[in-house]
Swiss-Prot record:
The lineage of its organism: Bacteria, Pseudomonadati, Pseudomonadota, Gammaproteobacteria, Enterobacterales. Keywords: Chaperone, Fimbrium biogenesis, Signal. Not expressed under classical laboratory conditions, but is functional when constitutively expressed. SUPFAM superfamilies: PapD-like. Induction: Negatively regulated by H-NS. Positively regulated by IHF and EcpR. Pfam families: EcpB_C (PF18649). The keyword Signal applies. Residues 1-20 form the signal peptide. Belongs to the EcpB/EcpE family. InterPro entries: EcpB_C, Ig-like_fold, PapD-like_sf. It comes from the Bacteria. This is Probable fimbrial chaperone EcpB. Part of the ecpRABCDE operon, which encodes the E.coli common pilus (ECP). ECP is found in both commensal and pathogenic strains and plays a dual role in early-stage biofilm development and host cell recognition.
Length: 222
């Protein structure tokens, strides 16, 4: 799989990443045995922030993913969807999946709109100031199939996901190339139907190890 799964879409308007709202992990997973997920966000700046959150369903979390319609209006809910976050404060955002309990994995983009509270309160005549202290951050939520089937194939340093739920795969051990050092490690997310070859770890070596996560379950492969 040439494209990394779950890219961060971070579009800033006049502020640096260090000043942006801290939304935690770029990608979040709701396992098949859970219908809720919590994310903690933090305002690490010295001023209050106005946060608005929107959800979009995606055909894929990869770069070529398109926004598609949800199966039902209340398929994925969240609370709170809008909040005022004081300086150096944090808040827990909760997500609730109420969609179909089928064998399909679903992908959502969480869009975080963040702007300085002082700018948000200004009138239309001063809207240019808002753009200098605002950000739009995109993260990904993967909802595993309610009926998850975990299957994979491994051969010659390559893993193929033959199931219907994304796997987190990893390899560690001696480096394949001496230029990379003695010990290497690789971590990837592997979507259903995709394959990934490890390129830094010498998986053919007896000390090379390959493993994966099926939800919360750790599975040694080699």
């Amino acid at each position: 799989m040439k494209k990394h799964l779950l890219p961060l879409a971070l579009l800033f308007s006049g502020i640096s990443p260090a000043q942006a709202l801290d939304v935690g992990d770029i990608s979040s997973f709701m396992n098949s045995d859970s219908s809720t997920l919590s994310k903690t966000i933090k305002n690490s700046t010295d001023s209050g922030r106005l946060i608005n959150i929107r959800l979009e369903r995606l055909s894929s979390p990869l770069d070529d993913g398109q926004v598609i319609s949800m199966d039902k209006p209340d398929e994925l809910l969240l609370t709170p969807a809008s909040l005022l976050l004081p300086a150096q404060a944090s808040e827990v955002i909760r997500f609730f999946y109420k969609g179909p309990a089928d064998e399909k994995e679903r992908y959502y983009r969480i869009v975080w709109f963040d702007q300085a509270l002082s700018d948000a309160q200004r009138d239309n005549a001063n809207r240019s100031a808002v753009a200098t202290a605002s950000a739009r951050i995109g993260t990904i939520l993967v909802v595993a199939p309610r009926q998850a089937n975990y299957h994979f194939q491994y051969a010659n340093g390559s893993l193929t996901n033959t199931g219907n739920a994304t796997l987190r795969i990893l390899a560690y051990g001696p480096c394949l190339k001496a230029a990379n050092g003695k010990e290497c490690k690789e971590n990837y997310y592997l979507m259903p139907g995709k394959s990934r070859r490890f390129t830094r770890v010498d998986t053919a070596d007896n000390k090379g190890r390959v493993a994966l996560w099926q939800g919360d379950k750790f599975i040694p492969v080699k």
